From Swiss-Prot:
GO biological process: flower development; root development; vegetative to reproductive phase transition of meristem
DNA-binding region: 59-71
GO CC aspect terms: nucleus
Protein's name according to its UniProt entry: AT-hook motif nuclear-localized protein 18
Protein keywords: DNA-binding, Flowering, Nucleus, Transcription, Transcription regulation
Position of the signal peptide: none
The keyword Transcription appears for this protein: yes
Residue spans of biased composition, Basic residues class: 19-30
Region ranges (Disordered): 1-75
Location of the PPC domain: 83-217
Listed InterPro entries: AHL15-29 (IPR014476), PPC_dom (IPR005175)
Localization, UniProt: Nucleus
């Protein structure tokens, strides 16, 4: 091979190699253009792609936010009492006033029932009816040991109102009973009482309810008897007193037979 051919051969090979490299680069460029990625932005896309930790931080939290429905609610404060509410009273009855009359007037004017819980103080000139039926009039000054009773406004009958008192005399004697006359205070008398506005007067016993209760008791007794009869019919072994293999071949009557009169429930 001469020198001329030697000098041209590497140029020929190098030109083919350059042509192939240029063709391959063109294909890669077209492929990137079809995918919508420009060759100059490849490094930027890789640089801006979020890592795993950043992706977790940017992820939107799921579920209800803390404290969204757990806010403390304002307390409900009732500033107005109901008309039928149960109220407590501390009543002070001045000297020389009738304790029983004062309580009756309070119940009538306020249209509320009054339940006397206790009281203390001193009274004079007391008339009481003792448990034996006798009426005793006491003169002098007595200390109140116990005071109880109730007063209802009209239209309740007067028999629904009254006081019961137990007194201690100057010599230590204790006398008590239902007050049937004036109970005059000889010193300020303090009474603890409760009032209510929804009292209703009823006469007992209630005859209609008694009849209803009797009917309910009779229906319950009949239901118990029917249930017992069904249990006897279902349990044929206990009715006949024979083994179950013999009962299958025996025809039982439609109803249980009572040898004697059926007991009443």
């Amino acid at each position: 091979m001469d020198e001329v051919s030697r000098s041209h051969t590497p140029q020929f090979l190098s030109s083919d190699h350059q042509h192939y490299h240029h063709q391959n680069a063109g294909r890669q460029k077209r492929g990137r253009e079809e995918e919508g990625v420009e060759p100059n932005n490849i490094g930027e896309d890789l640089a801006t792609f979020p890592s795993g930790e950043e992706n977790i931080k940017k992820r939107r939290p799921r579920g209800r936010p803390a404290g969204s429905k757990n806010k403390p609610k304002a307390p409900i404060i009732v500033t107005r009492d109901s008309a039928n509410a149960f109220r407590c009273h501390v009543m002070e009855i001045t000297n020389a006033c009738d304790v029983m009359e004062s309580l009756a007037v309070f119940a009538r004017r306020r249209q509320r029932g009054v339940c006397v819980l206790t009281g203390n103080g001193a009274v004079t000139n007391v008339t009481v009816r003792q448990p034996g039926g006798g009426v005793v009039s006491l003169h002098g000054r007595f200390e109140i040991l116990s005071l109880s009773g109730s007063f209802l406004p009209p239209p309740a009958p007067p028999a629904a109102s009254g006081l019961k008192v137990y007194l201690a005399g100057g010599q230590g004697q204790v006398i008590g009973g239902s007050v049937v006359g004036p109970l005059t205070a000889s010193s300020p008398v303090v009474v603890m009482a409760a009032s209510f506005g929804n009292a209703s007067y009823e006469r007992l016993p209630l005859e209609e309810e008694e009849e209803t209760e009797r009917e309910i008791d009779g229906n319950a007794a009949r239901a118990i008897g029917t249930q017992t009869q069904k249990q006897l019919m279902q349990d044929a072994t206990s009715f006949i007193g024979s083994p179950s293999n013999l009962i299958n071949s025996v025809s039982l009557p439609g109803e249980a037979y009572w040898g004697t009169q059926r007991p009443s429930f």
